[in-house]
């Protein structure tokens, strides 16, 4: 369970919790209760998992649950679309952090463009509009796009609305924290971070195992990771996720076709711009 994210202004409020276990800045509800009662607290592992396709939840099972989960959902035998995909941006450091603008935050326009590329039509033989066909299930979404950063989520939401040829469907672009308790037929995770010095500094937040666990396990049938061209080599969990997808299907780790003349400003840029 992910803990809440607080406004930095609250750090100046000098109200101390009665006990460390009640410190809302350090604990989620689950960790608070565990801290209070310790080993006296009864624990039950809910082993049967019904939400995700087996290929999706197996990553979480091996990475976070010591292989104790039992996948109860079977993949449809007539489903031609890949369950797992990785879509990489072209070479370059595309993350930006706005500090002095009216809108502050961290985002990657190239990853936003890559998501638009995915949901706007046919990519590597996969028609995303067909993947999103069918009926909605309960309160879940047809398409979910999760990201660690608020600004990225907001700009992705705007991108979804501007994709005119998408069918009418239930979609949500939100931070990973806001996706707790929710699910989507197809889930996209945008990591945002790049290989710049600031990107490396932000990796500790983005590569949190609880964050990746929540993001991946929201996907019911399809999961797509959108990340930087170098595959976040300094990460642990994200790198393991990419390796897992590559092991399942090497052909589903691909590079985005989205290019920009501004890529020429980077030391490393796509050779396609020389054509």
Functional labels for PLM-detected ranges:
Residues 1-275:
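Conserved helicase motor core of SF1/SF2 NTP-dependent helicases
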């Amino acid at each position: 369970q992910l803990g809440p994210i607080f406004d930095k202004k609250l750090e100046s409020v000098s109200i101390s919790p009665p006990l460390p276990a009640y410190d809302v800045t350090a604990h989620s509800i689950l960790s608070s209760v565990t801290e209070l009662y310790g080993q006296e607290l009864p624990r039950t592992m809910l082993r049967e998992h019904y939400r995700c396709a087996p290929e999706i939840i197996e990553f979480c099972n091996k990475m976070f649950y010591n292989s104790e989960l039992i996948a109860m959902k079977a993949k449809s035998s007539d489903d031609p679309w890949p369950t797992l995909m990785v879509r990489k941006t072209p070479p370059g450091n595309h993350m930006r952090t706005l500090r002095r603008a009216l809108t502050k935050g961290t985002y990657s326009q190239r990853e936003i463009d890559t998501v638009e590329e995915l949901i706007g039509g046919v990519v590597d033989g996969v028609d995303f509009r067909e993947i999103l066909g069918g009926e909605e299930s309960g309160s879940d979404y047809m398409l979910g796009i999760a990201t660690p950063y608020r600004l990225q989520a907001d700009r992705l939401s705007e991108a979804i609305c501007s994709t005119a040829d998408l069918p009418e469907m239930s979609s949500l672009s939100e931070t990973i924290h806001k996706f707790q308790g929710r699910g989507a037929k197809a889930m996209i995770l945008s990591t945002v971070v790049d290989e710049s010095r600031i990107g490396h500094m932000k990796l500790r937040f983005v590569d949190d195992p609880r964050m990746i666990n929540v993001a991946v396990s929201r996907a019911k049938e399809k999961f797509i990771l959108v990340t930087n061209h170098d595959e976040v080599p300094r990460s642990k969990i994200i790198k393991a996720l990419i390796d897992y997808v590559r092991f399942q299907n090497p052909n589903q780790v691909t590079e985005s076709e989205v290019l920009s003349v501004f890529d020429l400003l980077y030391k490393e840029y796509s050779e396609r711009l020389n054509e």
